[in-house]
Regions:
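Bacterial N-terminal signal peptides
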Residues: 1-8
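Substrate-binding/charge-relay-adjacent region of secreted/lumenal peptidase catalytic domains
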Residues: 14-126, 131, 136-408, 441
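Boundary at the C-terminal end of the N-terminal hydrophobic targeting segment
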Residues: 10-12
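Extracellular S/T/G-rich loop segment that most often corresponds to the catalytic His/Ser-adjacent loop
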Residues: 392-446
């Protein structure tokens, strides 16, 4: 009965058309917040050749205020044991039927894109995203911008040099035009490197602390949980990445940890290019796959990753998992400081992640090690301005209300956990976060 009610509610909420006239380039509107904060003239390294091919560009659509209110109510009902909608999760197509764009609106935008010379790659099941491909020249003409390269910390990055414009006929429906830059979120793990100089300890303690799966199972009392039959059987865990991995590394780790080797199911995001390996990213994903498989040995693990196209990254892996409803849990070990993303990009992500919640997908991410100084880097001549780096800001998506940030394996004392500089408390620009004075206990003694 509850399932029938959920289906009936969705059917009764078919989205109404929002684009009332055919879009035309004769009347354009600027999209505020679409200029990347690091695309600055002082870092400019020249214009991108007009024939450069860009695949998988995306237009993400916003919801109406009525849709947003209805979605918020649905998320509350799905978590309310007394509601008939309790834990009645939606499929992506059910989500589209209630919270996506009308098909007629999608058709109008696709027609305009094709008139600009773009080829349509796909439309999301949630009917909130169109992917298309074309050249840099077509992008410049269609969105009234220029594509430039920028030198950022020794890397050559590309991005639009101005805010983007779209036809006024559908500008109010657009949350973001994405995948036009090669800024990539960074892995949150820190490889072990001996400090130099090192303290001369007067005891047998080395000062270096390392954890194996057995240690973590003791620290978080996982052995009793697994012994009770809660080993992940029947659950699916998605690891999101942006590099290919070595499955041999994963198998060797499982064997060394005393677990039966079990390879993850690997999925290369369609359209993201050929499978490619990136050193820092491979290490992060190796780590995630190794630990998730040993801590929940009964779970099915998917590894969803992007290929060699530079304008794809781990956030596209997350989008794919959500739009295809892969995984009860989506695990992300990447982040970027809030100030290092354009406002429209954050708006896009904050529109996607509630869909995961409505579909019963739990999202977890690494909290990161930078606390309230997530933007800080080692200053170089091609670093973002120092004022930007030193601003109080935290990592995203750890700061999102729809994502659970996980950390704590360094086992610090409570005064560090509740410290402003240690956690980034109240340093988010966009979302409400716990204050440093809030009593939060996350350290389990053992």
């Amino acid at each position: 009965m509850a399932a029938a009610l959920a289906a009936a509610v969705c059917a009764a909420q078919t989205p109404a058309p929002r684009i009332l006239s055919q879009p035309t380039s004769a009347k354009m509107s600027t999209l505020k917040g679409t200029l990347h904060p690091f695309a600055q003239p002082s870092l400019d390294a020249g214009r991108m050749p007009s024939d450069t091919r860009l695949a998988g560009i995306s237009i993400f659509f916003s919801r109406t205020s009525a849709q947003q209110a209805a979605l918020a109510q649905l998320l509350d009902d799905q978590q309310n044991p007394s509601s008939p909608l309790y834990h009645r999760w939606l499929t992506p197509r059910q989500f589209a039927a209630r919270f996506g764009m009308a098909q007629s609106d999608i058709d109008k935008v696709q027609l305009w894109l094709q008139q600009q010379g773009f080829s349509i790659d796909s439309v999301s099941h949630g009917r909130n995203l169109i992917r298309f491909s074309g050249t840099a020249g077509q992008v410049e003409q269609a969105f009234q911008t220029q594509m430039h390269y920028y030198n950022i910390d020794g890397r050559k990055i590309f991005a639009p040099s101005t805010a983007l414009s779209v036809p006024a006929a559908f500008a109010s429906t657009v949350a973001n035009v994405g995948n036009l830059s090669s800024f990539r979120p960074r892995a949150q793990y820190v490889p072990y490197r001996p400090a130099n100089p090192r303290a001369a300890f007067t005891s047998s303690q080395t000062g270096s602390v390392f954890f194996a799966p057995g240690d973590i199972k003791v620290a978080y009392d996982m052995n009793s949980v697994i012994s009770a039959g809660n080993d992940g059987t029947g659950q699916t865990n998605v690891i999101a990445g942006q590099s290919a991995v070595s499955l041999t590394d994963v198998s060797n780790f499982q064997t060394a940890a005393g677990s039966t080797p079990k390879s993850p199911i690997t999925v290369l995001v369609p359209g993201s290019g050929s499978s490619a390996t990136y050193a820092g990213d491979q290490g992060e994903s190796d780590l995630d796959l190794e630990w998730s498989s040993t801590m929940a040995p009964g779970a099915t693990v998917y590894f969803i990753y992007t290929g060699g196209s530079p304008n794809y990254n781990v956030f596209d892996s997350i989008d794919f998992a959500i739009d295809n409803r892969l995984g009860n849990v989506i695990s992300i070990s990447y982040g970027a400081c809030e100030a290092g993303n354009s406002p429209s990009t954050l708006t896009q992500f904050e529109s996607i992640y509630p869909q995961a919640a409505a579909q019963g997908q739990t999202m977890v991410t690494a909290s990161g090690d930078q606390g309230s100084t997530a933007c800080f880097q080692s200053p170089t001549t091609t670093s973002p301005p120092l004022a930007t780096q030193e601003a109080l800001t935290v990592n995203y998506p750890a700061s999102s209300a729809y994502v659970t940030a996980v950390g704590g394996t360094e086992a610090p004392s409570a005064d560090i956990i509740n410290s402003v500089t240690g956690t980034g408390a109240n340093a988010s620009t966009y979302w409400e976060t716990p204050g440093a004075s809030d009593e939060i206990t996350s350290l389990l003694k053992y």
